[in-house]
Curated annotation (Swiss-Prot):
Keywords: ATP synthesis, ATP-binding, Cell inner membrane, Cell membrane, CF(1), Hydrogen ion transport, Ion transport, Membrane, Nucleotide-binding, Translocase, Transport
Gene assigned in the entry: atpA
UniProt-recorded Gene Ontology molecular function terms: ADP binding; ATP binding; proton-transporting ATP synthase activity, rotational mechanism
Species the sequence originates in: Nitratiruptor sp. (strain SB155-2)
Name of the protein this chain belongs to: ATP synthase subunit alpha
Enzyme Commission numbers on file: 7.1.2.2
CDD domains linked to this entry: ATP-synt_F1_alpha_C, ATP-synt_F1_alpha_N, F1-ATPase_alpha_CD
Length: 505
């Protein structure tokens, strides 16, 4: 017979249950969509929402509060927005946008909010960081002093880039801007630099080609691609560069070196303009909103070289700007030129004349990279910029005057060969020691009696000859990072010996 519970036992069980009872109340602040269109929703009822806070719509899409008005909130939707209609409910998530960071992202292609889009499965991220972070202050930084070799002769010799620098690549469409950036990424192989390529508003086919090119050269082993294509909502195109720089900052803050390419910030500004106009913010010059300068300055200021106390990491930025018919004085180009530490200017006239990379060395500058250039390159390229400028002047003059004196003719001949030396096929970056050798040969007159059309052949055969017969030359330049008398003597001997056997045919 079952044992009967005593009255006092029953009361003690009830008391225990009452004591253990926990009332869980889930408080959510929700609002209602008043209107929705073009990726922007007007929401009523979210009185305590923060600027930039993440919100969730009832269809699962996330949104970001950008306009905080008296009666409603302007929200950009980070998705397609299918299923959002007037009356849909929206709830606050109580946090700002975060992106996944860390080693798990290397070799992957992700979208603007850090989700993988390469079909290689989920990303096991161990850390998430806020997409909007404050740039390092003055005391946290150190002046740029280590070189970031691009592998492109014209850049490493004349417009050197240092780790932690922001160098703008600017030019018209189809002048080889992306190629310069991709070459730089390929050249970081074995340099322990993590590269991030951010594609904003590009055709998906173009991004696929870039990824394929990086894979072919083994560069995806240390590269992360962030893609917000032309078909994506403006909000995602606006966010992509910030997601990219957040990933780069993780490596910078952990004492590593990172390189980030923004391809391109013109389309980024257009996406932001689109969002701002739909949010009914007042337009300014060229219909861009008033804070379009801050849009790019807060992004590019996050690239920095940190001091030794903070781990001496660096984040180098290569923003790209597309100009219209070479107009560098438009709003966005002048903004970004004033934010960056120099610019590489690519010209369609040079490109069409077969001078590729089509860098105009006259107006391309690097404001801080000179301190990072290795001594050997400084020694051989010291007068190169001036020589090329004088050559351009003489060339223009020679079109009118037929009778040039001997010195001018020699200068013209030397200039033509130096221009030829600086040409380089795409996706074939050169190590700095090879660049030093060929520029040394040109600057010291070894090529004066070589046909201009044979310079390219001479250059690549010279590298092979030195590798076979005088490999110590490359090793010594790599180790000493300067040209001393011993290396110069060896170089002169090697070049003379090679010239004796070289045939231009």
């Amino acid at each position: 017979m079952a044992q009967k519970l005593q009255a006092d036992e029953i009361s003690s069980i009830i008391k225990e249950r009452i004591e253990d009872f926990e009332l869980k109340i889930d408080v959510e602040e929700t609002g209602k969509v008043i209107s929705f269109g073009d990726g922007v929703a007007k929401v009523f009822g979210l009185n305590n929402v923060m600027a930039g806070e993440m919100l969730e719509f009832d269809n699962g899409d996330k949104g970001m509060a950008l306009n905080l008005e008296e009666t409603n909130v302007g929200v950009v939707v980070l998705g397609r927005g299918e299923g959002i209609r007037e009356g849909s409910s929206v709830k606050r998530l109580g946090q700002l946008l975060k992106a996944p960071v860390g080693e798990a992202l290397v070799g992957r292609v992700i979208n603007a909010i850090g989700e993988p889009i390469d079909g290689k499965g989920p990303i096991e991220a161990t850390e998430y960081r806020y997409v909007e972070e404050k740039a390092p202050g003055i005391m946290a930084r150190k002046s740029v002093h280590e070189p970031l070799q691009t592998g492109i002769k014209a850049i490493d010799a004349l417009v050197p880039i240092g780790r932690g620098q922001r160098e703008l690549i600017i030019g018209d469409r189809q002048t080889g801007k992306t190629t310069v950036a991709i070459d730089t990424i390929i050249n970081q192989k074995g340099q322990d630099v993590v590269c991030i390529y951010v594609a904003v508003g590009q055709k998906q086919s173009t991004v696929a080609q870039v990824v394929k090119k990086l894979e072919e050269h083994g560069a995806m082993d240390y590269t992360i691609v962030v893609n917000a294509g032309a078909s994506e909502p403006a909000a995602l195109q606006f966010l992509a560069p910030y997601t990219g720089v957040t990933i780069g900052e993780y490596f910078r803050d952990n004492g590593k070196h990172a390189l980030i390419v923004y391809d391109d910030l013109s389309k980024h500004a257009v996406a932001y303009r689109e969002m701002s106009l739909i949010l009914r913010r007042p337009p300014g010059r060229e219909a861009y909103p008033g804070d379009v300068f801050y849009l790019h300055s807060r992004l590019l200021e996050r690239a920095a070289k940190l001091n030794d106390k903070l781990g001496a990491g660096s984040l180098t930025a290569l923003p790209i700007i597309e100009t219209q018919a070479g107009d560098v004085s438009a709003y966005i180009p002048t903004n970004v030129i004033s934010i960056t530490d120099g610019q590489i200017f690519l010209e369609s006239d040079l490109f069409n004349a077969g001078i590729r990379p089509a860098i105009n060395v006259g107006i391309s500058v690097s404001r801080v990279g000179g301190a990072a250039q290795i001594k050997a390159m400084k020694q051989v390229a010291g007068t190169l910029r001036l020589d090329l400028a004088q050559y351009r002047e003489l060339e223009a003059f020679a079109q009118f005057a037929s009778d040039l004196d001997e010195a001018s003719r020699k200068q013209l001949e030397r200039g033509m060969r130096m221009v030829e030396i600086l040409k380089q096929p795409p996706y074939s970056p050169l190590p700095v020691e090879k660049q030093v050798v060929i520029i040394y040969a040109g600057a010291n007159g070894f090529l004066d009696d070589i046909e201009v059309s044979a310079i390219g052949k001479f250059e690549y055969e010279l590298y092979s000859f030195i590798e076979a017969k005088y490999p110590q030359i490359f090793e010594l330049i790599r180790e000493r990072k300067a040209l001393d008398d011993e290396i110069k003597e060896l170089l002169n001997k090697a070049i003379e010996e090679f010239k004796a056997s070289f045939s231009a045919e």
